[in-house]
Amino acid sequence: MFYVQKELASHEAVIVALFEEEQTSSFVQELDKAFEGQLQVLLEEKELSTKKKAISKVHSLGKTEVKRYYFVGLGKKESYTTETLRSALGKTFKTLQAAKVQDAAILLDSFVTKKLDAIDVAHIAAEVQGLGTYELQTYKSDKKDRVELEKFTAITAEDAQEIEAALTVGYVHGRATNSARTLVNMPPNVLTATKLAEYAVELAEKYDMDYKVLEKEEMEELGMGALLAVNQGSVEPPKMIALIYKGKEEWTDVIGFVGKGITYDTGGYSLKPREGMVGMKGDMGGAAAVLGAMEIIGELRPEQNVIAVIPSTDNVVSGTAFKPDDVITSMSGKTIEVLNTDAEGRLALADGITYAKKLGANYLIDVATLTGGVIVALGNHTTGAMTNNEELFEQVLEASMETDESIWQLPIFDRDKERVRNSKFADLNNSPGREGHAVMAGTFLSEFAEDTPWVHLDIAGTSESSGAHDLGPAGATGAMVRTLATLVERFGEE
């Protein structure tokens, strides 16, 4: 699908950058010769816009071998960022998709500045081509045919092999994010814990990873009372899923991902209202993020050791479901007083974190659609983070900045730990109250990470979008897939 050439040839469409202060760039001047000065006229009359994310289409009318040029406005160079580029190109690829373009090229060097080199642009272009044109997988009987972009050529003077490699990495990042989106969008009667485990096993086998899928009996033997409590009311068996990627000869410096895999959350006996229950099929967004990251890792084969652990079940109401006031014993041996059955994700993650440590994780990153509180605090575009290790957090933060997935750190204070430990009947309680809800959830998880370097990512606000945007349709976003994979790719770099 991806090609690299030094000269422009025949294409259905070509994408060209337009900066506010460089309306007469060498690229535009060269094209303007073929248009006999008409491009400059269009610029002067503001028919070609340099505003951020403005897309201006110009037909060549046979003056060149290219049928249509799409000029992408990027604003001023001083405010040009990777986020600007991602949004602008995402919108552009959506436009090409709507026009049913099958052969497109990009004048890569027209997007290059002192801040962004050709490799950066190539990676982002290939990545957002997949993200921007992703379509919701539906179960409608009337399926419409979809015209795909079949050929995408980067026109550049830079080294072809390096650009091809960047295009490949970007494509892999975009495709894996879309895999996660598809998982999150699946209905809960289709994506059960069993089906999620089957998906994970297929992924592991495809990329020659080791894997384990613990059944209920094995969980009982290991004392995973927290996950088992959440599963008590369900007819669907729970699964503790582990994928093991060995990128080094020795099993050291192991990065452990733990993804919340609650395939549907009614709230249990702490029942959600109807409005709060619709959409809870997406409560396994953390599991999807982890699996998407493992897809990238499987494709790119970084020299790191990684395990991905997913505690999975649904949380439903029945005569056997766990209840407020229950006291349960986690795999760690710590006892937990249940004050809220709708705070089930942290219970599943507690055993997931302990199991990841048992498998050898030296660093922990958990990902979960954990609290509504994080949405109140940070909105729908920023993931909440908590940590017990600033060095590890800085690496996660740097990865998120590279992928333009916004993260903001929330605190853990001793007084928060005291609230989580406040129980007359157990070591911990699972829900001290609504105040500081996102912080309470993360603080609870820190009790199981203990001294292992750990970062918690609450994607409740970022996992799904209520409306269409430049990088995709309404629905699942695939939040943190690219950040987790980038963390692994860059881990330990100075």
Swiss-Prot record:
Tell me which UniProt keywords the record has, alphabetically. Aminopeptidase, Cytoplasm, Hydrolase, Manganese, Metal-binding, Protease
Where does this protein hold Mn(2+) 2?
260, 265, 283, 344
Its annotated compartments are: Cytoplasm
GO terms under cellular component = cytoplasm
For Mn(2+) 1, which residues are the binding ones? 265, 342, 344
Please list the disulfide bridges: none
* Main localization, broad class: cytoplasm
Cofactor binding annotation = Binds 2 manganese ions per subunit.
Cofactor(s) needed by this chain: Mn(2+)
Q: Which GO terms describe its biological process?
A: proteolysis
EC number(s): the record gives 3.4.11.1, 3.4.11.10
Q: What does this protein do?
A: Presumably involved in the processing and regular turnover of intracellular proteins. Catalyzes the removal of unsubstituted N-terminal amino acids from various peptides.
Q: What is this protein called?
A: Probable cytosol aminopeptidase
Taxonomic source organism: Bacillus cereus (strain AH187)
